[in-house]
Every structure is written in structure tokens, then in C-alpha cells.
Amino acid sequence: MRVALQRTLDTSFHFWKSERSLHTLDARAMELLAEVDLAAFAQLPAVELSYGRKRALEIATTLAMEPQLMLLDEPTQGMGTEDVDRIRQLIKKVSANRTILMVEHNMSVVSSIADTITVLQRGALLAEGPYAQVSRNPQVIEAYMGTAQTELVGAH
């Protein structure tokens, strides 16, 4: 497995764990890569992965801890459409049986993933609820779109 920066599989590493323990860890790492749809890239150095796939790898390393709560800070920022869709699907997939607290400004991503949306303005709670309700809230529209004439849609 070559997801460690620029090291290759045949590069010597010195570990304090036994070889058998390392094989167990390799097997778990491969499971995690498969879970985030990166198994086909296991032999590539992480530096060669696209930005979106690097973010998926970050999610895999978080999943290794089997968290009940995951914090994601703008997970799709700076991504192209294809990577955004891939990460959106991945977040939806890994959200089963865990809580995900996500800061995200891409309303398309938010609307397709979130059960509950909390909108803050200058640190104060502006609105909270399902996307359909929050996106029609006049205060939210005014704060983020500048007018209460239209519904909050699209990406920020």
C-alpha cells in the first residue's frame, strides 16, 4: 500500500509492530480505501491523487478511528464538479450510523446531504431546520442573497 506521501511499497520502513500486526493493519487500510472508493489507487503515492481523492483519503483516515461523530470543514471547497459529486456521495455513504457536523457553503451539497441545517450570521443563530424550510426563510435570504425576493439556491 502506497498512500504514505511519496514512499513506495518496497521502500523500507522501520516499525515497532510485528510483521503480522502490520499485515492486519494493511488489510484494514485496504478495507477503508475500498469504503471510500480508493482501492484502485492503493499503489499510488498519495501526492499523485487528485485533490478530491486526497479529501476522500482524509475521510478514510478519520473512519479508521470508527468515530460516532465526524467534523467536516468545507469538504468540497476548491473542487471541480466531478470531485464535488464524488465527495457528496461519499459523505452520504459514511453518514450511516454516525453524526456528521459539516460546515459547507455549497448549497447544492448541503441540500442533498443535510437532515438539519443551522445558519449562523456573525456567530448568532439565524435559522435552523430542514433545507426546504431554511432556504425559504426571509432572514436567511436577506443575509446571504441581499433580498427576500428569491429563494436561496445554488452555491455560494
What is the predicted function of each stretch?
Residues 1-156:
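Glycine-rich phosphate-binding loops of nucleotide-dependent enzymes
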